[in-house]
Amino acid sequence: MREIDVVKLYELAGNDALKLDEEIYLFSRLLYHNFELKTFFEDGSIPAEARKKMLVELHPDSSTLMRELIGLLIDQDLIRQLGWLAHHYSELISRKTGAPLVEITSAQVLPEDQKKEIMRFTEGRRRFEVDPAIIGGVRIKWEDGRYLDASLKGRLEALKEEILV
């Protein structure tokens, strides 16, 4: 199976490696959460130019490298590997920069003061996500496998386990 060489991609990105990481991540999350868009980008019967144009419409501020990368994935029928690419490129960024990824998930967009408080005890590159399913609170997941669940959903699940034992 053909795949993108993430090391070469990192070298090509140069000083824009972190920006590219964020762009790849955001686009992969968009496709992950939107079945219709995912189907559109993966459908080889839709002309490649139409799919590339859609990327520009969705992300008009995307970098030239990002547009060329997605164009390459479309042309080579590798767009299905975008999730894999996002994951492995992010891991490479962590190794190269020494800044591990920390994913912070909340039920709604956090106010800046709460973000700053979380940033005080987390080190590395941080990604803030919104997932209404956690009801309230936050979940923090470190790239090294550590996990803190201070969400209301997590507390309710723990309470359910205690009661059912």
What are these model-derived regions, one by one?
Residues M1-V165:
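Elongated, mostly alpha-helical coiled-coil "stalk/stator" tethers of large membrane protein machines
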